[in-house]
């Protein structure tokens, strides 16, 4: 599906505030709320809009430990590892990477004990290097793709 300039404007507004009412979007781009809703539904159906979400403050939620784990596979057990990753809520992000490591995992946990348990469970798939975050200095949600600048 190709998006046109109107769809792009709708996406920009949703990107700034996913809770915005269709009617309000329509007022800003000179369409009816129903027409906006139809366009949003079409973008959802075509996978342009995948989900709506919230951003929470991990520290305020009690996730006081953030770690980055470079993971090195022992063998070709990638499918098993990917299944394991999918079941673990402590792993907030997982990326297949180039270089010496196979994967980069971002882990957020309440305690060192939970982190240690996860790391012990990972050992059946390979080895890791652990980097603890001391302080988050920047967190950016990439909205530049939606910028008209």
Curated annotation (Swiss-Prot):
Highest taxon listed in the record's lineage: Bacteria
Key words of the record: DNA-binding, Repressor, Transcription, Transcription regulation
Biological process (GO), any one: response to amino acid
Cystines in this chain: none
InterPro entries (alphabetical): AsnC-type_HTH_dom, Dimeric_a/b-barrel, Tscrpt_reg_AsnC-like, Tscrpt_reg_AsnC/Lrp_C, WH-like_DNA-bd_sf, WH_DNA-bd_sf
Domain HTH asnC-type: 3-64
SMART domains per UniProt: HTH_ASNC
Entry keyword annotation includes Transcription regulation: yes
GO function terms (MF aspect): sequence-specific DNA binding
A cellular component annotation (GO) from this entry: cytosol
DNA-binding region: 22-41
Gene3D superfamilies registered for this protein in UniProt: 3.30.70.920, Winged helix-like DNA-binding domain superfamily/Winged helix DNA-binding domain
Function: Negative regulation of glyA transcription and kinB-dependent sporulation.
Family matches, as PANTHER family: HTH-TYPE TRANSCRIPTIONAL REGULATOR LRPB, LEUCINE-RESPONSIVE REGULATORY PROTEIN
Protein name: HTH-type transcriptional regulator LrpB
């Amino acid at each position: 599906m190709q998006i046109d300039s109107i769809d792009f404007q709708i996406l920009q507004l949703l990107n700034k505030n996913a809770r915005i009412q269709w009617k309000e979007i329509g007022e800003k781009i000179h369409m009816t709320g129903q027409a906006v809703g139809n366009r949003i539904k079409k973008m959802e159906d075509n996978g342009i809009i995948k989900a709506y979400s919230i951003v929470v403050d991990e520290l305020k939620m009690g996730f006081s430990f953030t770690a980055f784990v470079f993971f090195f596979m022992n063998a070709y057990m990638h499918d098993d590892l990917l299944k394991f990753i999918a079941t673990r809520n402590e792993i907030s992000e997982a990326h297949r990477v180039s270089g010496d490591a196979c994967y980069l995992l971002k882990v957020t946990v309440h305690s060192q004990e939970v982190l240690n348990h996860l790391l012990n469970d990972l050992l059946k798939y390979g080895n890791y290097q652990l980097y603890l975050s001391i302080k988050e200095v920047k967190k950016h949600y990439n909205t530049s793709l939606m910028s008209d600048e």
